[in-house]
């Protein structure tokens, strides 16, 4: 499962490629067809991450993606390849250099359009993300210090510290 640092990099890369531009959103597989129709043609404001969650803001609506164990993005410039397999979602836009840019999402655990209160409910159940600016580690410290659980298990608990996984636990 991709860990927090990977999601932060994805958020940065997607923001650089797509933010401030209308995005053509499709769901070749069909599982995200309603969400794709809602977002298609809208301008992407920004992409952020919190822990292992990715949030793409399109005005009042937010696309939430959690890659889970099997999810992945591929990206490129120019004309995207023909859709194949279980392609959940594709973004296409004119990139900052005038060339076409695209990204494909496959195998994600979550790919859904949420309102601000729904995003808040996700964030409320997570601990601090140490890679975010102004992250407050006192919450994690309090949860760790007050627990009798082994530190390795606590580090894997996303309500204690968001974004940490087996790579950092090891």
Question: Where do the protein language model's features map onto the residues?
Answer:
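Structured catalytic/nucleic-acid-binding cores of DNA maintenance enzymes
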Residues: 1-170
């Amino acid at each position: 499962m991709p860990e927090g640092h990977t999601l932060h990099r994805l958020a940065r890369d997607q923001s650089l490629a797509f933010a401030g531009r209308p995005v053509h959103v499709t769901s070749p597989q069909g599982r995200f067809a309603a969400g794709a129709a809602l977002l298609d043609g809208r301008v992407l404001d920004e992409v952020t991450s919190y822990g292992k969650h990715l949030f793409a803001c399109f005005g009042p609506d937010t696309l939430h993606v959690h890659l889970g164990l099997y999810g992945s993005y591929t990206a490129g410039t120019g004309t995207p390849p023909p859709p194949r397999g279980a392609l959940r979602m594709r973004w296409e836009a004119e990139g900052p250099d005038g060339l076409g840019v695209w990204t494909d999402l496959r195998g994600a655990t979550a790919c859904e359009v949420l309102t601000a209160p729904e995003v808040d409910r996700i964030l409320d159940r997570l601990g601090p993300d140490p890679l975010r600016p102004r992250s407050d580690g006192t919450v994690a410290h309090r949860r760790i210090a007050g627990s009798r659980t082994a530190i390795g298990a606590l580090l894997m608990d996303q309500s204690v510290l968001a974004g940490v996984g087996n790579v950092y636990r090891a």
